[in-house]
Amino acid sequence: MLKRRLLLLWALSLLASLVYSAPRPANQRVGIVGGHEASESKWPWQVSLRFKLNYWIHFCGGSLIHPQWVLTAAHCVGPHIKSPQLFRVQLREQYLYYGDQLLSLNRIVVHPHYYTAEGGADVALLELEVPVNVSTHIHPISLPPASETFPPGTSCWVTGWGDIDNDEPLPPPYPLKQVKVPIVENSLCDRKYHTGLYTGDDFPIVHDGMLCAGNTRRDSCQGDSGGPLVCKVKGTWLQAGVVSWGEGCAQPNKPGIYTRVTYYLDWIHRYVPEHS
């Protein structure tokens, strides 16, 4: 009975978010602001996560990092509700709901230190029931080496099907959007988030396991949560971050905050083979 009640409460809260309730001071991310439609040949690792309401509705993004594993944000699937039967995965799709071929999950692994997105460890792994066939249209994104820092000013890309502005949902036919964003140094990002707060500068908001990117014209937003932030390094696309949280979307002095992939590589590789 308790489990059923928790599931009902979780589903109702998810439904409320899908009809765009008023934003909180810090929002888990849902869309692309200041971007444009992606071409069909780009971002072959992009994933749409689905939850069953009247139909399998998109609620978060993700990335294929191995033929049988998807990387996403913990707040999309946890911390309490982890039954894989509740979710489906749609691999690279130009327009949401057009030609769906939904895939079932075998298990969901949420980082054990996750409690809220703002608290960090906002990362989860989804194991597909069956490995996908890798092709030019669908293939994994490479994870970075632990030594990769993605220095401030690096131009990266974030993709998703979320809001295109604060409280402005992506309109039909729901195209995959992309936006180019600059990496923002963590200490600068932390200072920006302390502006107007009374927590004191010695209370960290942006932790080591986080990465900041974006500006007042370009950012991820609500619906993009769990999706990839990718950067091209020496000719190879690497996933630098996972869309996590932020204050509003493309707000002045409030970059988007991402889970820093390199910080969690050891945990990821406990489950995901390093070479597919």
Curated annotation (Swiss-Prot):
Keywords: Disulfide bond, Glycoprotein, Hydrolase, Phosphoprotein, Protease, Secreted, Serine protease, Signal, Zymogen. Pfam families: Trypsin. PROSITE patterns: TRYPSIN_DOM, TRYPSIN_HIS, TRYPSIN_SER. It catalyses: Preferential cleavage: Arg-|-Xaa, Lys-|-Xaa, but with more restricted specificity than trypsin. Disruption phenotype: Mutant mice do not exhibit any visible phenotype when maintained in pathogen-free facilities. However, after peritoneal inoculation of Klebsiella pneumoniae, they cannot efficiently fight the infection and show increased lethality. SMART domains: Tryp_SPc. Glycans are attached at N133. Its EC number is 3.4.21.59. One of its GO terms (biological process) is proteolysis. SUPFAM superfamilies: Trypsin-like serine proteases. The modification Phosphotyrosine is found at Y98. It is found in: Secreted. Residues 1-21 form the signal peptide. GO terms for molecular function: heparin binding; peptidase activity; serine-type endopeptidase activity. Tryptase is the major neutral protease present in mast cells and is secreted upon the coupled activation-degranulation response of this cell type. Plays a role in innate immunity. This is Tryptase beta-2. It comes from Mus musculus.
